[in-house]
Every structure is written in structure tokens, then in C-alpha cells.
Amino acid sequence: MSSDIKIKVQSFGRFLSNMVMPNIGAFIAWGIITALFIPTGWLPNETLAKLVGPMITYLLPLLIGYTGGKLVGGERGGVVGAITTMGVIVGADMPMFLGSMIAGPLGGYCIKKFDNWVDGKIKSGFEMLVNNFSAGIIGMILAILAFLGIGPAVEVLSKILAAGVNFMVAHDMLPLASIFVEPAKILFLNNAINHGIFSPLGIQQSHELGKSIFFLIEANPGPGMGVLLAYMFFGRGSAKQSAGGAAIIHFLGGIHEIYFPYVLMNPRLILAVILGGMTGVFTLTILNGGLVSPASPGSILAVLAMTPKGAYFANIAAIIAAMAVSFVVSAVLFKTSKVKERSDIEAATRRMHDMKAESKGASPLAAGNVTNDLSHVRKIIVACDAGMGSSAMGAGVLRKKVQDAGLSNISVTNSAINNLPPDVDLVITHRDLTERAMRQVPQAQHISLTNFLDSGLYTSLTERLVAAQRHIDNEVKVTDSLKDSFDDTNNNLFQLGADNIFLGRKAATKEEANSFAGEQLVKGGYVEPEYVQAMLDREKLTSTYLGESIAVPHGTIEAKDRVLKTGVVFCQYPEGVRFGEEEDEVARLVIGIAARNNEHIQVITSLTNALDDETVIERLAKTTSVDEVLALLNK
């Protein structure tokens, strides 16, 4: 499937599911009422059972129609979409779920086109009159057309589809649907399939029979659970270690996207989920299982909650059978696999991520259209197809890392791709969804991943964000860190001379490097000997490492009286000296400072300006020429 076709299919499926998913609560309410109060329910009640008919006939289709119209034409589109949907409902003798999916967007489209046509042409003072009457008149016309045309046409289409379904069920062909459903799920079409196709068919069948098998074709957690169990027993590396947690999230939380990377890293496992899905559907067909309403999310808890009286054995058996077959097939595939390196899910995830980036001419760290500049990033969104389970978990992992890194000015949230706001700075999506996200918000930077719980990617991103923030804060950080070392009483300019530059130094520890800088300040007549200890004491409080291979040691506020005159020494350590707790916090340039006023600001400004050019830092760290140092710092 080409990239454009896949994106179009995903977008269409997402549009269908977007009409249903916001209203899932209403479907669940209807399902619970049906399961409890109909004559065959748990608590039969003739009076309360009267809610069932009007809800499925009017409430649910109207909600879908309103939502579909709103997706296309905003609030006015929702109103006209609902009016149009009413025409479809009255024009047919069956629940109009498919009809509402046509009528709602049609109403939204028509009012949107009208609004665009009259934009700027309405005289002042007549806006409300035109808006109200246009919606009413267009809604009336569309309702009549829907009543006369769309309703009867959809009724005929629904009967044809129902006949096809009945034929498949009668001839035991329904399990073949898994051949298409399971691979489509891996392409993130699971919500589109479940809510865009199976839910409308299932609601109609449930209204007639009290339950529907369609609600468990895609939502059955068995096939995915079988794959994860196989990883737990026969997998290798971090894939085996992480499969247990993924299984809990998948089976109890209903987030099916969690197992997709495990299949993607070993594509042969698609066979396992297909056979598992077919087994589950076959079991449901034989034992007459099904649900009264969509199970969303597709967890075992939601499935049991939507199971009608008398269908528990069938549904549980279908889940167990699907899980068992998927597990056995996966185990056989694992045992016959000779590709050991693919057992590590993080390695596989990173490999696919890097290969996708490299195929587009980008570096692995810049998948999508990420630049090296993350300094402006303030809003990060982890996006998936529905904007719920998988992206919410990914956002949770990244948010904790960002918060732990102290990046309080960066927000991390999750969203559906279609709802990405225009002010987002960085978008993180699954690699199969990145192109859609890039079309939705082309101005943002984008990162692709294959596993929303890829801790390694989030850690790498956080480190880059920290480095970018440190780069911005360098000058402020220097000034703030030195506020306790000088007062602002003089304006004389301090000039860095050749006697203050020491190249080719070596030191085993930062204490040794700080002591040398302090001793040179003493020899230069800038400070009293006690100032050296004050520099060591200051380092114990917080590291004076600024990043970009630079450290700026100086004394404590109590030692300012030990400063005789402002002085700066430039010490070069080509092999580096570790200044921070992290292994990469290594300083090659150690700038010792003693100041009572702001005479040193010229040198500090030159240093912080140099941070903007990595080549300058590299030259300062490697040069053997004092004159070159002076030239670079006195630009």
C-alpha cells in the first residue's frame, strides 16, 4: 500500500470513528439499559425497557449526525447535520447509523459552503438573521431530501449488508474477516474498523437479536494477548522483560496498540494474530456469543461488562481460544526463528526508526522534520490515531522525564492527530502516522517512533531539550552564578592578557583544576590565598559546569573581601575534566574568575557568545596559540 493511499484510508477511517468515539458513553448507557431491563435481561422491567427503542432509533443516530456535521462545519454544521439526520431516521424503518454517518457530514458540508459563499457579503446588523434562517432553511431542505432519498437508499443498503452478513454467518465464513482485520489493526486502523464499520452493523444486529458478534471481532483481546505471552516465555532481551507489563496494559486496560510493536518487530507474527482472530470469531459463531454494545476500550473488563446474560461462556471461551491459538503459533514461530538480534524490542524499534529517517535523507536523531534547534520548543504533543490510550501512556512517560529534568517551561500532552493545535512545537507519533501528522501541522517539528513506550527515545529527546535549554540559559546562568561574587560599583574594563591564559593543562579531578585556577589568580595578584579554598567550597554547593565543555569556577559570597582586584584566568584542558555528576559533563575550558565589580563582564560576554558556535569552542579547546585565544575572545 502506497504512502498516500494508506494516509487516505487512515484519514477516512479516522473520520468515521471520530463520529462514533465521542459518543461511546451514550452507546454504553444504551447497552447497559438493554442488558438490564429488556425481557431477557438481568433485571427485566417493562417500564424502563421503553428507553431502549427511542435511544437506538433517535438518540444515537442524532448524536452521530451532530458529531459528523460538527467535524465538517463546526457548531452550525452540527446543528444542520442533526436536522438532516432526522430526515434519514424518519425515512426508514430501522436504526439509521449508516444513514447518520452520511447525513451528518452532508449537512455540515452544505452549511460550510454556504457560509464561505456569503462571507463578507452580509450587511452589518443582519448577521444573526442570516445565520439563523440559513441554517433553518438549508436544514429543512436537506431533511426533506434525506427523508425521500437517503433514508430509503440506506435502508436498502443496510438490508444488502445484513443479507451478506447472514450469508457469511450461515456458511461459517465470518472468521475469514480476521484475514483483513488483524493486519489492518497493525496499521492503526483498529478504531476505524471497530467504530466505523462494526459498531453500526453491531448496533443494528444487537437491536434485533439482543447481542452482536461484530462487537468482538476487532475488540477481542485474545490474539494480542497470545503474542505477548509468547514473548514472555520465548522472547529474548528487553522484549521479554517488557512483555509482562504490556500484557497487563493490553488485557486489563484495553490498549491494543501496546502489542503492535511486538508484531512489527517480527512480521511473521501477523500470521499468529490472524489465526487467533479467526479462532475467536469461529468460537463466537459456534457458541452464539456477542456483546450488547461496543466494548471500548477493548479490555476483558469492558467485554464482560457488555456481555449479555447467557453469553459469558461463549465470550470468555472465544477470548481464551483466540489467545491459545495465537500463543501456540507465536511460540512455534519463535522456535523456528534464527534471527536472534530481532528479539530486542528497543533495538528493533530504534532500528526501524533510524532506517525510516535515513531513507528520507535525515539523520536518525532527526526523524520526521526535526531540526537540531529545540530551543524554542515549549509545547510537545504525543499523538496517535484516537488520542487516547497509546499516546496518553507515551505522553505520561515523556512528561515524567521532562519534569524530572526540571524543564518546567515545557508542556507534554497527548492528542488525536486530527485535533493537533496549530501552536504545537513538537509532535511525536508512530512512524505509520507521522506523514498524517505532518500534513495536519506542517509548521511543527516531528519525531517518529514504533513504540509509544520507547523510554530510550524519550530519554534522548529529554537530553537534547536540556542541552538546548542550557544553551539559552548560559549567559543568564553565568551572570546569576556570579552575583554573589561582585558588586556593581565600578565601570572599569578588565582586559584579558596573555599572562592569564594557560594551555595544554591536565587534571585528574575538578578540585585539581579549580585549585590551579585559584593559584594562578593568587600569583597574578588578583586574590588572597584564602580565595582558593573559597573556590573549592563554592564548587561543593553546586557545580560551576555550564555545559558545552565550559566551567566557570569562582569563590563564595563570603570570600569577596579576599578579592584584591578583578581577574580572570583561562585554563585549557584538551583531555577534559569531569565537573558534573553525569559522564558527559566534562569541561575542557575552565575559566577561573575573581571579581568585586563588573569588570569581568567583557570576558564573560565573549565566552557566552562563543557558545553559539561549536567550531569556536572546538578551536579554544584544541589550540596551542595564546594569540588565537585572545583573538577569539576579543571578537
Curated annotation (Swiss-Prot):
Residues 12-342 form the PTS EIIC type-2 domain. An intramolecular phosphotransfer takes places between His-554 and Cys-384. The record marks 538 as: Stabilizes the transition state in the phosphoryl transfer from HPr to EIIA. GO terms for cellular component: plasma membrane. GO terms for molecular function: kinase activity; protein-N(PI)-phosphohistidine-mannitol phosphotransferase system transmembrane transporter activity; protein-phosphocysteine-sugar phosphotransferase activity. The chain crosses the membrane at residues 24-45, 50-70, 134-155, 165-185, 273-292, 313-334. Pfam families: PTS_EIIA_2, PTS_EIIC, PTS_IIB. One of its GO terms (biological process) is phosphoenolpyruvate-dependent sugar phosphotransferase system. InterPro entries: PTrfase/Anion_transptr, PTS_EIIA_type-2_dom, PTS_EIIB-like_sf, PTS_EIIB_2, PTS_EIIB_2/3, PTS_EIIB_mannitol, PTS_EIIC, PTS_EIIC_2. Residues 378-473 form the PTS EIIB type-2 domain. It catalyses: D-mannitol(out) + N(pros)-phospho-L-histidyl-[protein] = D-mannitol 1-phosphate(in) + L-histidyl-[protein]. Residues 494-635 form the PTS EIIA type-2 domain. Homodimer. This is PTS system mannitol-specific EIICBA component. It comes from Klebsiella pneumoniae.
